[in-house]
Amino acid sequence: MRRFYTAESVTEGHPDKVCDQIADAILDECLRYDPSSRVACEVLATRGNVFVAGEITSGYEPPVFEVIRKVLEECGYCTDGIEMDTFVHQQSPDIAKAVSVSKEFRDNIGAKLRDRSRGAGDQGVMVGYACDDTPQLMPMPTVLAHRITRELSACRRSGYIKDIFSDGKAQVTVEYEDGKPVRLESVVVSCQHGAEKNLKKLDAEIREKVLRSALRLLPPDEDTKILINPSGKFVCGGFDADTGLTGRKLMVDTYGSMVPHGGGAFSGKDCSKVDRSAAYMARYIAKNIVAAEFASKCQVSLAYAIGVAEPVMIEVDTFGTGKVCADDCLAAAIPLVFGVTPVQIMESLRLSRPIFRQTAVFGHFGRKEFPWERTDKVLALQDAIL
């Protein structure tokens, strides 16, 4: 059966992504000096104005204005005359108590194990996914879209393409046949540029200097539609054209249109929030299942209740590609191999470190520098299942 899947990516200067980076840079500052910091901050930015709001409980007071300026400058923006404001208070004491002491501990349910001592920071369902489309075990459209924006950003920073700015986007549609990527259907690239930039030259430069290398995994054919700045002139961009807000690029952050999303954003949240930490764990589990060759595709869903340590749902879907056992058998093995309480997730993935600014652009998954991308549970899975 033939199907089409699409994914998009944005560059570091896209307004929403700048806000994500500011939020995660603030989080990193807190974690650098106090690994137990509780952070949930949102950022809104528009012409000449940046607002930070949320809850921060930490033994360290981050230099928010300094962080904002640093991120803006690193993303290619001038900070002269910028207005900044903060509306930050401490985490709700009710939430803090529920997270610090789990319901299992409060109700004396079962053994009072340290792994079950802390509760989830919120309710929700988090989804992780892996497939054998690519060496990263990620969907092909997602990998290609991020490669395009990475190359575009590198060309801007190095001056390899001149007179372009940091606001840009890419979108890739891939044709699948019987669940496998077979051809590149379309590519869309939009890149902000200077007023004097020749658009035909820009089109040629992006095709030659960006797409040629970015699309090596699945090169275009003669029928692939390639659209460069299809709106025409793209001079007014960045915060002059759009208002940025944290948490508005959820599908860019994850897997594209192929995989559902539980709805919880990542950036600006410490990993006591299962919105973030459980999404990383779900990816870790799914990737190890595919790496173990138990399935060609695997989607792992974890659901939590606020203040409760153990997940209220663990579900696995291999979409009929399972090779060893039924999906419910895989789901039953997960708690035996992976720790899925908040304490276990934080410790096994080392999520109290200041590593989050780098996650906030070019996707949270499929990047070997992150601990949830390890495939070190393959043997343990095989022992538990075979």
PLM features per residue range, with description:
Residues 1-40, 45:
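N-terminal, positively charged regions that mediate nucleic acid binding
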Residues 6, 48, 66, 73, ...:
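Glycine-rich, mobile lid/loop segments that gate access to catalytic sites or pores
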Residues 8-10, 14-19, 118-134, 235-259, ...:
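Conserved phosphate/anionic-ligand binding catalytic regions in large, soluble enzymes, centered on
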Residues 12-31, 133-150, 269-293:
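Alpha-helical support elements that line or immediately flank enzyme active sites
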Residues 37-41, 168-174, 224-228, 294-305:
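A short glycine-rich, hydrophobically flanked beta-strand micro-motif that places a catalytic Asp/Glu
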Residues 43, 124-131, 170-193, 241-259, ...:
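Short beta-strand elements
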Residues 46, 295-297, 305-386:
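Internal helix-turn-beta structural module
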Residues 197-289, 293:
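Glycine-rich anion/phosphate-binding loop at the beta-strand->alpha-helix junction
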